[in-house]
Every structure is written in structure tokens, then in C-alpha cells.
């Protein structure tokens, strides 16, 4: 007898007879649903579907029977609908004919079920019953009702599922979602509808216009006015508009207000660079500002206000005169100074040459004669100097300059490639050499660069070299992906990171002019910083001015001098002794990570979603950092990572849900922490704190995997003693030991003084080495947690509230199950003095040690069989 034949199995036959009745099938599935046996449940469901005379009508019978049964978590009704959808797709039989009478009858029933069911049923019902072709009037009425009830998310989701967007429109459905910061849902709503996408952009762009107040819109939706509207400020919203504009391929003319806001943001940035950081020359500042402001009256007014806020009236008037700003758009004090300058015939210059000379004395100076800086703009120039550029066994510094782009859609293109060798600097004019793309100059340039980068005997020095070289492909197609051909490269960005992590003291500078990047590295190694005032200049202008030539040469030549200094005294900078011989560093790449061969470290990941992989600076081991000396601040998207790092003893601060990512930069600067972030803020944060002080973490990894990646990246040493040396909740590293008898007494006093406590909020907040629960696991034999901390004394507690420390911290005793007090071998508890959490020895310690065993330093493990330590004396 075939065991697979229902006729040979009485129980199976009974199931088939039962399955012909949809309600009996539902009853059987409800019984299995409570057991959570998903495999058995699926098999029973599919057998039942096959036995139903009409599976579609049977589904509706079951759903109608389930109406009104709402609960938390996944519903059985939604699961059955999804399973029938899968079952139908696996059947060879055709579905009901479109527009047939039978299908219309089923659609009418399905629409009625849908209007009385949770949103999770929408997708499977729409697929099974082809609801996109059903009577849309009932569906539209239901969506409008959801919207009227303030269930905006459900209305938009259902409308998109049923393809009702054309009838529903975009303004009505998207405005309340935008007010609730549900941009992703709005994007899904308009996906596949180009006309709606354009209307959405027009709507969002209208909110970016000068003088617009988003609160006027929010007042029409009282259900969402309590939410924060910061993300809908013109500055933030314009970023979203420009992102969607590029994604949808919409012409920039459709979003003029967002472009204006972007130009205003660029003006703020340039004013900060010029007047606060003083890292931009007046000439370059004027050049960029004129291009941004143009003839826009509103931008002229905004620029006038920026000038007044960043400088005095005299300086503001000088700038206004150079920029030809209309006098009527200037504040009164600035207008007075401007009229005075015009009477004099020119703006007074306060001995700027003397100031420039003083500035030059403070910065790194090019140590070679000016005649040793060569500008190569033709294939003949390249041929003449090819021997010097490609000389074997030499060290060269490589850098690229490009004109910054301040408007959306622009792509920076390289203008100049600098190659420094001992005693000389060669400035390769990329603009001249790359035109025409198939010309003799372009071919000679591409061939020379490829030879230089692929020769392993030539050590190429750079600072973020990969990011620089990637731009060469935009001007020279033959050099696309040239960064992957690098052999014998050394990126000083990684070396700088190791120096910073090893606590090489940064120079004491004015906070506003705080050094970063290569300028800071030059300051730390050579004693004077690199002058970056020409960095944002117009590198496409020809001929280059003398200041640009000197800056470009110094930018590349300083790499040679930094490398020489590091090789002479590596110990001074906490680097490996064999740094001088490190031309082909050994790689320690994480599986799946892509890096160009022969390069020590990429400047930044192509997309800031993945943790850059640490690579040794030399054949020797990179400097290690003890876990307890490693200090980080995590943004609010990485709170799980912060808790995992605390679990291993790392001092990890985390931002609250309401704190902006700019707060991370403030904390990092004030407390000397490294920023761990994810997503778009990475590049902005890295620019604020400097190279090596900000890391982008892959959000697709679990928290413990993220922790491993971060610790490996910074070469952090973790020992068994570090595990749980910090409180995972508050980051405090101070504990008090509490004996078991004392804990019994405290729990008894607390319960009798305040009455029985609920194990709700406090219980869920209290977390321990052994997770709180009614029946805790015992710790593995010999696996103990013994913190060197003092024992809790009665004098440490307040007399009137025995569960509160003298400083006001309340011990979270409600999180300790009574059963834990009876655990054999449990000697004591640990109380965090920062937040009052209670911890105790349990199986969680062993699990953490096992999970991170490849990270733990070889040392005696508390999880190896050994006599459990006990206190020399007990005060109780």
C-alpha cells in the first residue's frame, strides 16, 4: 500500500474529508498554528487546498470566518492567503478567465473581505483575485475612508498594492506621509508612474521656496503636527528633491527652488571656509561665490546676511564691492562702508601682502627650487620626462586636483595629476592631455599612468589615493578602474589612522581652524601644516596661477618627506620598525572585500555602507589598542553595535534617537572618540573629524558581526577580563558586589516597603550576564565572572529606601527573578553604580566568550575549568 496515497491512510482520508469543508480546514490549521510547527502547518494547508472543491471560494469562506480576529504578530488569515497564493502559482491548471462572471463574483466578495481585514491581506488577495481589474469604486472608497480616518500609511500601501495611484493622485496621499518622514513609502507609492513622480517633485520643490513655512501645511493634518518637522526644512528637503530628481531623470528646471537652496548651502560652506577656517583665499572665494549667486536677488540678500554674520561691516563692504552686490540689498552699516569705498575709488587693502607672508611662514614650504616644478601639457612633454617618472626602485608621491562642484548633477573631473620624485615635481595637465580622447596626448598619458601604477618596483605614496585615481576614468576612458591596477602602493591614510589611534598628540590649534586630513599628518610629522587655501580653487582655469602651481607641487612633494620621516623614526609615531621596507604590505582582507592589489588602504569605500577593511601598515603587526582604551561614539542607527562593544569592554557612547549626527562630531572632538556611523552622514562626519576618526559600518550585518569588523579594523585587543567590564545599558565601568544573602534581604525589604512590583518595565530594562527569566540557566562549570570591585555595604544604601544607593541610583531589583537566588554555586551579584542594573554569573558569559573566541587574546579563560575565586572575606 502506498503510504503517500490518502486512501491507504485512514487519518489522511479523514483529513481529506475534513479538508473539503473550508471551515474544518481552518479549524485544523488554527490548532497547528498555536504549535508553531510551520513545516507541518504548510503541508496540512497545501493538502487542504488540493482537497477543496473551489480553493478560491474556500479561502473567502475562511477569511470571512476570521473577520474581527485581530491580534499582535502575524495573523493566520494572512498566512493562509499567502500560502494559497504560492500553491496556486505551483499548480499547472490555469486561473479563472479574466472578466468571467465567476471571477467577478469572487472579486466582489474579496473586496468586501479586504475592506474589513488588516493591510497584510491586501497583496495576496490582489494577486489571487486579480483585484486590479475589479470594480475600483469600492476599492477607492475604502482607501479614501482609511485616509479620512488618519490611517495614511495603510491608505497609501493599499492604493499602491491595488494600482490605484492614478485615481488617488499624489498630493493628497503623499503630503501626510511626508509630514511623518515616510519618504520611502512615498517613493514606493509613485514607483512606475513618471507623471506622479514629476508631480511629487513639483510639490516637494514648492516647499523649498524662500519664505515657505511647512507649519502651514502641518496645521491641515492635526494627527501629525506633534511630530518633528526638522527633516522638512528647506535645507533637508532640497537634498531629498535633488536625489529624487537624479533618480527619476527629471530636468533640473522642474525643481528651481531646491537648486536655490543647494546654492545657499554652498554659500554657507564657502563663507565658513573663508571667514572661520580661513582655508580659502579671497580670490578663490570670490570666484566660486560669483558663480553661485549669479543674478538671483534672493541669493544676493542671503549672501549679504552671511557676510555680516561672518565679518565686520568693512570686510563685508569690501566683499560686496568685489562681487558687485546691489547696494539696496545690503544692511545699512555695510551700505555706508560701500559708499565710502566708492568715493575713494577702490577698496582699501589692509597690508594683505604682509599678512600673506606671515601665513606662509606658518605652513609647509616646498623645499625644491621653482624651476624643478614641471608642467607637462603635451605628449612631447611626457616623452621628454618619461625616464624620470618611470625610474625603477624609486618612491613617488601621487595626487590629483579637480575643481569642486557645488550644484546637483555635477561630476568633478580631474584637472591635474601631480607626481613627485626626489628633487622634482611633475604636474600633468589632464585637461590638455585628455583632449581629444583618442589623440596622441591622451594615449601617451594613459599609457604612462598605467605603467607607473602597475610597476611593483616603484612605491606609490598617496593620501586617499584610490579615491583620487578613480576620477581619472571620467576624463580618460582608458584609465577607468585604473585604481585596481596599483602594485606597490602605500596609502598614508592608513598610516595616519594608526598614528591617530595610537594617540599621537594633535597640534593645539584654534578650534575654528582645526586641521584634518593630509594637512594634519604633515603637521604631526614635519611640524608645520599644509596650506590648503588653494584646494578649492578653479583648477580648470588656464593658465594656472603661481599659487596653484606651488600648492599642487607641495601637495605631492610633502608625501615624500612624510614617508622619509616615518621611516627614520617609526617608533616616535607608534608604528612598526620595518615601515621603511614596507613596499608590498601583507593583506588581511575580509572575505568578499574588494581592494586593488598592492595598495595598503583605500581612502574610503565606494559606498559608505561597508566597514573599510584594515590592512597592516607593514609586514609586522600593527599597533594594538586595549579594549578599555578604545573610545567610540555610535550614531542612533548603531545602538546594537554600541551595546555589543560595551559587552567587550569598549567605551562606547551612543546617540539618542532625537540627536542629530552632528552631535557625534561634537562628542568625538570633545572626548577624543572615533565615530562609528552608517549611511549618508559618513562623508560629512569624516570631513569634520579627520581621517581615521570616522568609520562607516555595514548595516546589513548583525550587531556582533559589526563589532568584530570594527575591532579588527582598529586592531583592538580584547581579553577575557574585558567581557562585561562595562554596563551594556549605560556604559559605566564601576560595579558593586552584592552577596546572595544581601540580595535576598534587599529584595525582601524592597517588596515589603513598596508592595509587590510588576515585572513589566523595570524587568524588561534589567539585563544581566545571565538574562533575567523565571528559570535561568546555570553557568557552565568553571565559567565564572569575577570583577575586581568592592562589596556593597549597608552604609552605601539610603536608610529610608534600601534599594537606592547614596547617590540616588536605584538598584533594579525587579529584574532579578526569585529563582536566581536558588541557583547552585551562585556566590554574588553585581550592581552597576551608574544605572543600578543587576548582573549575575550565568551562561551568557560563556556564550559571548564562545562567539568572540577568535577575537580574544590568548590568555587564561574564565571558562576553563579552574577553582572559582571567592572573596577573602565577606562583610555580611
Curated annotation (Swiss-Prot):
Keywords: Exonuclease, Hydrolase, Magnesium, Metal-binding, Nuclease. Its cofactor is Mg(2+). Pfam families: DNA_pol_A_exo1, Mut7-C. Residues 578-607, 751-781 are annotated as: Disordered. Its EC number is 3.1.-.-. Signal peptide: none annotated. It comes from the Eukaryota. GO terms for molecular function: 3'-5' exonuclease activity; metal ion binding; nucleic acid binding. Residues 517-571 form the 3'-5' exonuclease domain. Gene3D superfamilies: Ribonuclease H-like superfamily/Ribonuclease H. GO terms for biological process: nucleobase-containing compound metabolic process. SMART domains: 35EXOc (SM00474). PANTHER family: 3'-5' EXONUCLEASE DOMAIN-CONTAINING PROTEIN (PTHR47765), EXONUCLEASE MUT-7 HOMOLOG (PTHR47765:SF2). Belongs to the mut-7 family. Possesses 3'-5' exoribonuclease activity. Required for 3'-end trimming of AGO1-bound miRNAs. This is Exonuclease mut-7 homolog. It comes from Homo sapiens (Human). The lineage of its organism: Eukaryota, Metazoa, Chordata, Craniata, Vertebrata.
Amino acid at each position: 500500500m502506498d503510504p503517500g496515497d490518502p486512501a491507504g491512510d485512514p487519518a489522511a482520508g479523514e483529513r481529506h474529508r475534513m479538508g473539503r469543508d473550508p471551515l474544518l480546514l481552518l479549524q485544523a490549521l488554527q490548532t497547528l498554528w498555536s504549535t508553531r510547527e510551520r513545516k507541518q502547518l504548510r503541508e496540512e494547508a497545501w493538502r487542504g487546498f488540493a482537497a477543496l472543491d473551489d480553493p478560491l471560494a474556500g479561502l473567502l469562506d475562511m477569511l470571512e470566518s476570521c473577520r474581527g480576529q485581530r491580534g499582535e504578530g502575524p495573523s493566520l488569515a494572512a498566512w493562509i492567503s499567502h500560502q494559497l497564493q504560492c500553491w496556486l502559482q505551483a499548480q499547472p491548471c490555469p486561473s479563472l478567465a479574466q472578466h468571467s462572471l465567476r471571477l467577478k463574483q469572487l472579486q466582489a466578495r474579496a473586496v468586501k473581505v479586504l475592506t474589513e481585514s488588516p493591510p497584510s491581506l491586501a497583496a495576496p488577495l490582489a494577486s489571487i483575485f486579480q483585484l486590479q481589474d475589479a470594480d475600483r469604486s469600492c476599492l477607492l472608497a475604502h482607501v479614501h475612508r482609511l485616509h479620512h480616518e488618519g490611517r495614511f500609511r495603510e491608505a497609501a500601501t493599499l492604493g499602491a498594492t491595488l494600482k490605484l495611484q492614478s485615481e488617488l493622485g499624489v498630493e493628497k496621499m503623499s503630503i501626510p506621509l511626508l509630514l511623518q518622514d515616510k519618504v520611502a513609502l512615498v517613493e514606493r507609492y509613485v514607483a512606475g508612474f513618471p507623471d506622479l513622480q514629476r508631480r511629487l517633485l513639483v510639490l516637494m520643490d514648492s516647499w523649498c521656496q524662500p519664505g515657505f513655512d511647512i507649519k502651514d501645511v502641518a496645521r491641515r493634518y492635526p494627527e501629525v503636527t506633534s511630530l518633528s518637522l526638522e527633516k522638512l526644512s528647506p535645507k533637508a528637503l532640497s537634498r531629498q528633491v535633488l536625489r529624487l530628481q537624479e533618480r527619476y531623470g527629471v530636468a533640473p528646471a522642474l525643481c528651481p527652488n531646491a537648486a536655490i537652496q543647494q546654492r545657499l548651502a554652498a554659500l554657507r560652506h564657502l563663507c565658513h571656509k573663508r571667514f572661520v577656517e580661513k582655508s580659502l583665499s579671497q580670490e578663490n572665494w570670490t570666484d566660486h561665490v560669483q558663480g553661485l549667486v549669479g543674478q538671483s536677488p534672493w541669493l544676493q540678500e542671503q549672501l549679504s546676511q552671511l557676510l555680516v554674520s561672518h565679518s565686520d561691516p568693512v570686510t563685508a563692504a569690501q566683499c560686496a564691492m568685489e562681487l558687485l552686490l546691489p547696494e539696496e540689498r545690503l544692511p545699512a552699516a555695510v551700505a555706508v562702508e560701500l559708499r565710502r569705498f566708492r568715493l575713494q575709488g577702490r577698496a582699501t587693502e589692509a597690508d594683505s601682502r604682509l599678512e600673506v607672508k606671515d601665513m606662509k611662514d606658518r605652513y609647509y614650504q616646498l623645499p625644491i627650487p621653482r624651476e624643478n616644478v614641471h608642467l607637462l601639457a603635451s605628449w612631447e612633454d611626457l616623452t621628454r620626462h618619461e625616464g624620470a617618472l618611470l625610474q625603477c626602485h624609486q618612491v613617488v608621491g601621487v595626487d590629483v586636483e579637480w575643481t569642486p562642484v557645488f550644484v546637483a548633477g555635477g561630476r568633478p573631473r580631474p584637472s591635474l595629476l601631480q607626481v613627485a620624485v626626489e628633487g622634482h615635481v611633475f604636474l600633468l595637465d589632464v585637461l590638455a592631455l585628455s583632449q581629444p580622447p583618442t589623440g596622441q596626448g591622451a594615449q601617451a598619458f594613459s599609457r604612462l599612468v598605467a605603467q607607473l601604477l602597475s610597476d611593483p618596483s616603484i612605491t606609490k605614496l598617496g593620501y586617499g589615493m584610490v579615491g583620487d585615481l578613480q576620477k581619472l576614468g571620467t576624463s580618460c576612458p582608458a584609465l577607468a578602474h585604473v585604481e585596481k591596477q596599483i602594485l606597490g602602493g602605500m596609502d598614508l591614510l592608513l598610516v595616519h589612522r594608526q598614528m591617530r589611534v595610537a594617540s599621537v598628540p594633535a597640534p593645539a590649534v584654534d578650534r575654528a581652524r582645526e586641521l584634518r586630513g593630509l594637512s594634519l599628518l604633515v603637521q604631526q610629522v614635519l611640524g608645520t601644516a599644509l596650506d590648503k587655501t588653494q584646494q578649492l580653487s578653479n583648477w580648470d582655469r588656464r593658465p594656472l596661477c603661481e599659487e596653484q602651481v606651488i600648492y599642487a607641487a607641495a601637495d605631492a612633494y610633502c608625501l615624500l618627506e612624510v614617508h622619509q620621516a616615518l621611516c627614520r623614526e617609526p617608533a616616535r609615531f607608534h608604528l612598526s620598525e620595518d615601515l621603511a621596507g614596507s613596499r608590498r604590505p601583507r593583506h588581511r582582507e575580509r572575505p568578499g572585500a574588494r581592494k586593488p592589489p598592492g595598495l595598503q588602504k583605500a581612502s574610503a569605500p565606494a559606498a559608505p555602507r561597508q566597514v573599510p577593511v584594515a590592512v597592516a601598515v607593514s609586514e609586522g603587526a600593527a599597533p594594538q589598542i586595549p579594549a578599555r582604551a578604545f573610545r567610540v561614539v555610535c550614531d542612533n542607527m548603531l545602538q546594537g553595535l554600541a551595546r555589543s562593544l560595551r559587552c567587550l569592554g569598549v567605551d562606547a557612547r551612543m546617540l539618542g534617537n532625537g540627536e542629530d549626527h552632528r552631535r557625534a562630531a561634537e562628542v568625538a572632538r570633545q572626548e577624543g572618540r572615533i565615530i562609528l556611523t552608517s549611511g549618508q552622514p559618513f562623508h560629512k562626519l569624516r570631513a569634520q573629524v579627520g581621517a581615521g576618526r570616522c568609520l562607516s559600518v555595514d548595516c546589513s550585518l548583525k550587531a556582533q558581526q559589526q563589532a568584530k569588523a570594527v575591532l579588527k579594523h582598529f586592531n583592538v585587543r580584547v581579553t577575557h577580563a574585558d567581557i562585561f567590564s562595562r554596563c551594556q545599558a549605560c556604559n559605566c565601568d564601576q560595579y558593586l558586589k552584592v552577596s546572595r544573602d544581601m540580595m535576598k534581604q534587599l529584595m525582601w525589604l524592597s517588596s515589603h516597603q513598596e508592595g509587590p512590583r510588576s515585572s513589566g518595565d523595570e524587568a524588561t530594562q534589567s539585563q544581566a550576564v545571565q538574562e533575567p527569566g523565571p528559570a535561568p540557566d546555570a553557568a557552565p562549570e568553571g565559567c565564572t565572572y569575577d570583577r575586581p570591585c568592592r562589596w556593597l555595604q549597608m552604609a552605601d544604601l539610603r536608610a529610608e529606601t534600601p534599594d537606592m544607593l547614596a547617590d540616588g541610583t536605584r538598584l533594579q531589583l525587579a529584574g532579578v527573578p526569585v529563582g536566581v537566588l536558588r541557583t547552585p554555586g551562585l556566590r554574588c551579584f553585581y550592581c552597576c553604580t551608574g544605572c543600578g542594573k543587576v548582573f549575575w554569573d550565568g551562561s551568557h558569559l560563556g556564550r559571548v566568550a564562545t562567539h568572540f573566541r577568535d577575537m580574544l587574546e590568548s590568555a587564561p579563560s574564565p571558562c576553563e575549568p579552574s577553582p572559582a575565586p571567592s572573596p577573602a572575606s565577606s562583610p555580611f
